[in-house]
Curated annotation (Swiss-Prot):
Sequence similarity: Belongs to the GTP-dependent DPCK family.
GO molecular function ontology, one term from the record: kinase activity
Keyword Transferase: yes
Enzyme nomenclature, EC number: 2.7.1.237
Protein name per Swiss-Prot or TrEMBL: GTP-dependent dephospho-CoA kinase
Residues that hold GTP according to the record: 35-36, 54, 56, 109, 132
GO process terms (BP): coenzyme A biosynthetic process
Keywords: Coenzyme A biosynthesis, GTP-binding, Kinase, Nucleotide-binding, Transferase
Amino acid sequence: MYLLNDKVAHELKKPFGKVYKELPSIEGKVVSIGDVTTKHLLSNGIIPDLSILDFKTKRNIPVDIPHKFKTIFEVENPQGCISDEAIERIKYLSTIHDRDMALIIKGEEDLLTIPVIKYFPEDTSVIYGQPDEGMVLLKITDELKQKIEKLLKEMEER
């Protein structure tokens, strides 16, 4: 389990990619992280390969996503950390060549962008919400994977 600290929290406030109000067209493998982002993609006809959700926004406002995912998995991931269970499930899901999967988080999904970048293949598009700004779209690259490895080393491991 990795625990968030102030130094890493400060780093994570900076988007890993470009912030959009409306996303451009997206091709290839897509992972969405967050309920509002996933709902936006689905309502625009974009079905992510994997959607990571907790059915809340801003920690406690319920979000209704009227979509039936093809495959659903659940894990626990407490606020402010990346649980071993979440890491292992994301690692596993990165090897599946399927679409319309959901990883339902009991807890909080905010930090799970980190293991997604670590384990999903290069050129995967990752979309997550940047509170009060829009959606961040990034393509996984080797350089980004190296940045994530550095962040993980700076987090407290338990």
